[in-house]
């Protein structure tokens, strides 16, 4: 995909500001390993896994998810300060970091490579930083309180940009130094490199300033960082957010769908099927036929009774109706189940195997099985100012936290 084809590139115009920084990162000692310090993003960690992570004194979750709710923001600040004072964290010279994740994608091994630096926050209406999903205000309020007290970015947003020249990519590969290597429970290998060559760092910033950036993951973190920047006008350090940027043509840029599971006591299965069939073109099929029939915006429906359907919608000229998450939201969740009126509960799961197991155990009234979102479609809609429904995309693997922090003091 070439972003320039959509009229985004403006020769000579200054767009994003992406810079190296003097990051603080784990100083492993006394037999410590990377696993003791890092974690998935705070919003995808279950309770049991959190207990395991927080059993390690210097794990990042002891900062991002402090349990003492009354004073947790202030205590997290004190904890971070103590890590710095004790040498548990060390500060680098100004650097970019290269984050490489090797993973299995449905039988194919892929490598996703991102550049980690600090990104200057801007209002969306400036047109340089592009969102693609709606966000939850409650989550943003919690993160803003943490940011105010910490004066540090502990977790990275994930962005997509056009890319760097092959010559610059080779320079990066030749000069980056491996600092961390870790394989997680899902079999994803994480490699973290430090790049401190001033000339190469300057060249990265120069090439990025003529590009725009799509937020792939971390809308809450970005919007929180922007609000924090607006609270601190004139403070340059506080106008930046920690960001991992991946080129749009990177072969490891994989997007999974996030399936919807519905629970309700307000409509029977028979009436729900009737309502959906009047709003969409449906065909009753076996589960195997449903799985093989998923394509474009043809979605699958699995009911508690075991009945399965394929459902389609004539999208017409409106590009939003080409997005099956939008069709599911408007025609099924809101249209039939009245989820926007509180008459149904919607939960989300990106792993089809997990959804299938839950439906076999009859845990939900309905599961809506969606297709892999197209990056091109996401770009096209984002460029015309469209926000997609929450949980439209699941970029796999997630960007892990704890490899490096950005302090704004």
Question: Model-found features: residue ranges?
Answer:
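Surface-exposed, charge/polar-rich loops and edge strands
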Residues: 2-409
């Amino acid at each position: 995909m070439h972003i320039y084809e959509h009229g985004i590139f403006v020769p000579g115009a200054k767009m994003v500001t992406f810079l190296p920084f003097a990051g603080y990162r784990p100083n492993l000692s006394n037999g410590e390993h990377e696993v003791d310090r890092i974690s998935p993003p705070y919003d995808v960690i279950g309770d049991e896994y959190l207990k395991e992570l927080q059993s390690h004194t210097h794990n990042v979750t002891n900062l991002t998810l402090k349990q003492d709710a009354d004073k947790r923001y202030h205590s997290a600040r004190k904890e971070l300060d103590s890590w710095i004072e004790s040498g548990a964290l060390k500060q680098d010279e100004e650097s970019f970091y290269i984050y490489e994740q090797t993973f299995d994608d449905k039988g194919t091994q892929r490598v996703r490579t991102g550049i980690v630096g600090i990104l200057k926050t801007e209002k969306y209406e400036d047109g340089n930083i592009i969102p693609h999903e709606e966000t939850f205000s409650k989550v943003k309020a919690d993160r803003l309180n943490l940011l105010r007290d910490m004066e540090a970015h502990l977790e990275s947003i994930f962005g997509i940009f056009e890319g760097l020249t092959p010559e610059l990519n080779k320079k990066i590969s030749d000069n980056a130094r491996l600092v961390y290597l870790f394989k997680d429970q899902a079999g994803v290998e994480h490699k973290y490199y430090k790049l401190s060559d001033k000339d190469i760092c300057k060249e990265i910033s120069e090439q990025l300033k003529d590009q725009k950036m799509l937020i792939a993951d971390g809308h809450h973190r970005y919007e929180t960082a922007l609000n924090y920047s607006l609270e601190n006008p004139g403070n340059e350090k506080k106008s930046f957010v920690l960001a991992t940027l991946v080129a749009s043509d990177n072969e490891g840029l994989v997007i999974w769908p996030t399936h919807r599971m519905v629970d309700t006591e307000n409509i029977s299965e028979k009436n729900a099927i009737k309502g959906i069939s009047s709003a969409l073109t449906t065909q009753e099929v076996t589960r195997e036929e449903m799985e093989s029939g998923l394509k474009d915006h043809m979605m699958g429906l699995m009911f508690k009774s075991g009945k399965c359907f394929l459902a389609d919608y004539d999208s017409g000229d409106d590009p939003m109706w080409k997005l099956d998450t939008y069709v599911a939201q408007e025609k099924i969740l809101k249209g039939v189940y009245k989820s926007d009126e509180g008459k149904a509960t919607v939960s989300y799961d990106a792993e089809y195997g997990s959804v299938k197991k839950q439906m076999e155990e009859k845990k939900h009234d309905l599961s809506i099985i969606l297709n892999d979102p197209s990056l091109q479609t996401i770009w096209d809609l984002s460029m015309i100012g469209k926000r997609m429904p929450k949980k439209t995309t699941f970029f796999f693997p997630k960007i892990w936290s704890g490899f490096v922090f950005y302090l704004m003091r």
